[in-house]
Design a protein with these regions (language model features):
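Extracellular/periplasmic helix-loop-helix junction of adjacent transmembrane segments
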Residues: 71-100, 137-142
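12-transmembrane solute porter fold
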Residues: 47-63, 68-70, 79, 89, ...
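C-terminal membrane-cytosol helix-exit motif in multi-pass small-molecule transporters
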Residues: 171, 211-229, 246-258, 276-292
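Helix-loop-helix hairpins in multi-pass membrane proteins, especially solute transporters
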Residues: 103-245, 267
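Cytosolic juxtamembrane N-terminal segment immediately preceding the first transmembrane helix
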Residues: 2-63, 77
């Protein structure tokens, strides 16, 4: 199969839809590319530019999880916060991010991964602007929630797009680059946060996202085809699973953070919240297992945990993340004091 010398993702998406050219142009942003067009794009050198866009988008949201830590002492001082408020600023982003990953991944399969990527960029940019303009704790925490929602849209869309757009040996290379960016961005975050805070103020750690996201949005329309996954199953979208996972994870995070301030004596609010979160998460697992047995689309395939490599791999990743983010939060405050 021959390749076009200048094949854009808009061309791929438009050509994938039968009908008049003007109709294709009107739906180019959301049209889903078919297998032939994806294969043609995958053979084009332009696929590496698409990978660059996806990698930078991934790096931006991962970096935002660690860049705030170094700026916390300045934020605490200028906004008059206590340690619990500082915890909310860092933790709420990761909590929302994690709670929505399963849901957003399914949404990308159904509505298009580039579509989800673009939506995530818009949401993440909006959250960054709100964060940069914040003058108190409440709007800053709300902004971090918005950023978490955007980040949860971006990460799975980049991973699944890489899987769909690359073939054979190129796929292994692309996944290697994806993993390297994810690890490297987390390490660069504290360094970049320190530089920006020192020379431009803590607001700069959020303003820096805006021009990057705008450029990525435009380039994604040009270089990243819109792919989708299978959406088989008669059970529809797992709304209850979304609610259970969000409430469960949110309750656990709230209990842990507030427990540091109020204490964990029963029946204090943190303890009750932790118990509620645990019960809701158990209900989430049981519900997901029921949907799996009924062959309905599920947010989490709990049968995967029967594989030792999957279970131990996720356990290891969790322990590493706990240690990493604990240090990112505590170390800057300790060194400043």
């Amino acid at each position: 199969m021959s390749t076009k010398p200048s094949l854009s993702s808009a061309d791929v998406s438009a050509d994938a839809q039968p009908g008049a050219t003007e109709k294709a142009e009107g739906t180019a942003v959301t049209a889903i590319a078919n297998e032939d067009q994806i294969a043609e794009f995958s053979a084009s050198p332009q696929r590496w530019w698409g990978l660059l866009v996806l990698a930078v988008g991934l790096g931006m949201i991962v970096l935002d999880g660690t860049i705030v830590g170094v700026s916390l002492p300045t934020i605490i001082s200028e906004l008059g916060l206590d340690i619990v408020g500082a915890q909310w600023i860092t933790t709420i982003y990761s909590a929302v991010f994690a709670a929505l990953l399963l849901t957003s991944g399914r949404a990308g399969d159904r509505f298009g991964r580039r579509t989800l990527f673009l939506v995530g960029l818009v949401i993440f940019t909006g959250g960054s602007v709100v964060a940069a303009l914040s003058t108190s704790l409440a709007p800053l925490v709300i902004a971090r929630v918005i950023q978490g929602i955007g980040g949860a849209c971006i990460l799975p869309s980049t991973l699944s797009s890489v899987n769909a757009l690359f073939r054979d040996k190129d796929r292994a290379t692309a996944f290697g680059i994806w993993g390297a960016v994810m690890s490297g961005a987390a390490a660069v975050g504290p360094l970049l946060g320190g530089v920006l805070t020192q020379f431009a103020g803590w607001e700069a750690i959020f303003w820096v996202n805006v021009p990057i996201a705008v450029v990525l949005f435009l380039l994604a329309l040009r270089w990243v085809p819109n792919t989708a996954g299978e959406t088989n199953g008669a059970g529809g979208f797992d709304v209850l699973g979304l609610l259970l996972s969000g409430i469960g994870f949110g309750a656990v995070v709230f209990g842990i953070i507030q427990g540091a301030k109020i204490g964990f004596a029963f029946p204090s609010a943190p303890v009750v919240t932790l118990l509620v979160g645990a019960v809701v998460l158990v209900a989430f697992v049981l519900w997901e297992n029921r949907r799996r047995k009924n062959a309905d689309p599920a947010l989490l395939d709990v049968s995967m945990f029967s594989y030792a490599t999957f279970s131990w791999g996720n356990t290891t990743a969790m322990l590493v993340a706990v240690g990493e983010f604990a240090l990112v939060f505590v170390l800057p405050l300790y060194l400043v004091s």
